[in-house]
Amino acid sequence: MDKNELPPDVALMWRLRETPRRGPKPSLSLDDIVRAAIEIADADNDLGAVSMARVAERLGNSTMALYRHVKSKDDLLVLMSDAAIERPDPMPEGVDWRTGLTFWADNVLAAIRKHRWYAKIPISGPPAGPNNLAWFDAALGVLNGTGLPEEAKVGVVMGLITYVQGEVRMAFDLAAGYDENPAAFQQFGATLRQVADPRQYPAVARLVEAGVFDEVGSFEDESEADFDFGLQLYLDGVAAFIDRVSPAG
């Protein structure tokens, strides 16, 4: 494939189709536009707050000036999705695959927490921008010593991405729900006692009887604990998979 045949969004993220211009260097760059859009989304904690008009206003330029660099808001969101995640921290030297993937997942979580709106960006394709590809490469590299086939490494990493993204999105949604109606969470155990007939919902009734929902601690602490629990559970499965299929397991 020639570079001119690359998908438009890929070419955009890699800056492969910027129009050369004669004369003085323009006062506005594509990086300026993306940075301003990220700042707006961060300030409002809302991806929907980003518009070409608001970005132009923030930069002190006309909306038409932005369109010389980026054709649409959709293109701008593509650029934001790669720029906001930045590059991953270097992997510590000499770590085993499990420690490495734990480090990687924790860093993905930290990166998304810096830009909570990031969790709302639709995932419509494989990682193709320079920053997202760097994260993908880092996770794949951790699996090098496992003896897994290359295709299996991709499966492990994609499963981990699915877990992290799903857990983050659910945690953010639940946190928003808690802020709106904390009583629904605090009274959940009492509510279940009233509606969950043990004959119809025996497993739920056992949870209620055990007092699992009686105490509601810090929502953020519980979310962190849930993330770590699910992550290690997933990695337990990866360990069993490596032992089963890899000579180096």
Q: Whereabouts are the PLM-identified features?
A:
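Hydrophobic alpha-helical connector segments
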Residues: D89-A134, E150-K153, V157-L160
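Helix-turn-helix
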Residues: D32, A36, I40-D75
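Hydrophobic alpha-helical bundle segments that form small-molecule/ligand-binding pockets
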Residues: W135-V157, I161-A190, V238-F241
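N-terminal intrinsically disordered/low-complexity leader segments
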Residues: M1-L28, P202-G211, S246-G249
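Amphipathic C-terminal alpha-helical segment
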Residues: T162-A176, Q194-F219, D236-R244
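Short, flexible active-site recognition loops that position polar ligands and cofactors
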Residues: V216-D228
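Amphipathic alpha-helical interaction segments
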Residues: D32, R54, D75, F103, ...
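Alpha-helical structural segments
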Residues: D32-E39, D75-P90, F103-N107, A134, ...
